[in-house]
């Protein structure tokens, strides 16, 4: 009888998924008591082929469930747990490697007949001199609750309402679920012995600019949980971004009005504040020519892009959030 269901959302990342599945197949847990549900966020032949290589052979309880169209990881996880047979639902991601004892430790600390959630220990290996992107990803190690390494009873998910599919990117959907657990008085237990390794994926040059789009979901999370957002979410650099934009605007006004003194003050402020952002991002990171040039170039763009997406989210979700 299935007692626990592992849900793994994925989409067109067969190599990463393969490594994750290898780790899940090595769990020190009776293979007849757990199922693995791989949910593809849309039609995905490569993922289907990867799963079919193992279905009924390496693991008797593995299922592939594609969404009819791409809706985001929150929707994929919902589809998975709603079709799960276990009373306990464990979540991890396709780019993660669960420790062989991961599932056993989660189940050992979870009463399937209670409304309870669990969060494990996530390890993000980074180099001695990491990139800015690696350093940001490493923050997952100190996060309170992330879907890369968590579990809960199915009843707890039902009570909390599952994942909010408005979070259509991989950002803040796990915080939203955590806050809903808190609002519904569902305890969240930390299980240090349930370990997942979350390697940092290779990222393209300038990835930090693309990442700014996720900030629009900060507005949605704030609208739904203003008290918990203020208490638990640390805002990074918004004041600095606004100051940079203000200095840039002063420079433009000075140029347009031919007020050279005003233009110079604005230029000096913009350049100085942007330089401080560059140095903050380079602190304790890799000082290669490629990385330094990336930090310099993207730091001139990020304040404008970040504030744009933050305001976009505020307008879209109709909330005062700056």
Regions found by a protein language model. Give the residues of each.
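Acidic donor-binding segment of Leloir-type glycosyltransferases
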Residues: 22-66
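Catalytic donor/gating beta->alpha subdomain of glycosyltransferases that bind UDP-sugars
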Residues: 164, 169, 175-230
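Cell-envelope/extracellular polymer assembly enzymes that use nucleotide-activated donors
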Residues: 2-5, 35, 176
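Short aromatic/hydrophobic "clamp" motif used to bind/position activated sugar donors
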Residues: 89
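Membrane-embedded multi-pass helical conduit in multi-pass membrane proteins
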Residues: 243-313, 317
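Glycine-rich, basic loop-to-helix element that forms the pyrophosphate-binding segment
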Residues: 67-84, 144-148
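Conserved donor NDP-sugar-binding/catalytic core segment of glycosyltransferases
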Residues: 97-130, 199
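N-proximal low-complexity "stem/linker" segments adjacent to membrane-targeting elements
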Residues: 1-26
């Amino acid at each position: 009888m299935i007692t626990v269901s592992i849900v793994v959302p994925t989409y067109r990342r067969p190599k990463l998924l393969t490594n994750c599945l290898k780790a899940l197949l090595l769990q020190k847990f009776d293979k007849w008591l757990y199922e693995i549900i791989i949910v593809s966020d849309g039609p995905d032949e490569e993922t289907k082929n990867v799963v079919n290589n193992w279905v009924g052979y390496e693991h008797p309880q593995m299922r592939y469930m594609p969404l009819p169209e791409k809706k985001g990881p929150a929707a994929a996880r919902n589809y998975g747990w709603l079709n799960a047979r276990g009373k306990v639902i464990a979540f991890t991601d396709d780019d993660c490697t669960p420790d062989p004892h991961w599932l056993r430790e989660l189940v050992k600390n979870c009463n399937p007949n209670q409304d309870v959630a669990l969060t494990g220990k996530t390890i993000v290996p980074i180099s001695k001199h990491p990139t800015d992107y690696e350093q940001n990803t490493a923050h997952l190690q100190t996060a309170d609750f992330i879907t890369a390494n968590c579990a809960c009873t199915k009843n707890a998910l039902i009570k909390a309402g599952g994942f909010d599919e408005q979070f259509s990117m991989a950002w803040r959907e796990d915080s939203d679920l955590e806050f809903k657990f808190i609002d519904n008085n569902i305890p969240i237990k930390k299980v240090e012995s349930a370990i997942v390794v979350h390697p940092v994926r290779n990222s393209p040059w300038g990835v930090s600019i693309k990442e700014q789009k996720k900030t629009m979901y900060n507005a949605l999370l704030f609208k739904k949980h203003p008290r918990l957002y203020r208490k638990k979410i640390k805002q990074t650099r918004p004041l600095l971004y606004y100051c940079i934009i203000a200095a840039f605007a002063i420079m433009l006004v000075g140029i347009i009005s031919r007020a050279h003194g005003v233009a110079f003050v604005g230029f000096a402020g913009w350049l100085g504040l942007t330089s401080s952002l560059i140095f903050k991002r380079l602190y304790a990171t890799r000082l290669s020519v490629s990385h330094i040039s990336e930090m310099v170039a993207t730091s001139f763009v990020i304040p404008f892009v970040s504030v744009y997406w933050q305001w976009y989210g505020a307008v879209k979700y109709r909330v005062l959030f700056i």
